[in-house]
């Protein structure tokens, strides 16, 4: 399965969540509402989840092995970095 499209919507409110992402795989399957969050050790992705009962959350969709998670993170962070660079260039003009 290959990542064929990454669409990022930056979150403008202050806080730890930086953006919401939609990722398309093989031009056939899309996962919406992946979050980019700034944690103590830098940025990480949080897969879409649903609240279950008393404050517990359960992922709706997620990679089942670390290599797939790494490929997904790399694709998302590359696009996020590209978007951040373009915003910075536009601000400096």
From Swiss-Prot:
GO BP terms: division septum assembly; sporulation resulting in formation of a cellular spore
Entry-linked InterPro entries: SpoVG (IPR007170), SpoVG_sf (IPR036751)
Transmembrane segments: none
Function: Could be involved in septation.
Entry protein name: Putative septation protein SpoVG
Family as reported in the entry's similarity comment: Belongs to the SpoVG family.
Entry keyword Transmembrane helix: no
Assigned keywords, A-Z: Cell cycle, Cell division, Septation
Residues in coiled coil: none
NCBIfam families: PRK13259.1
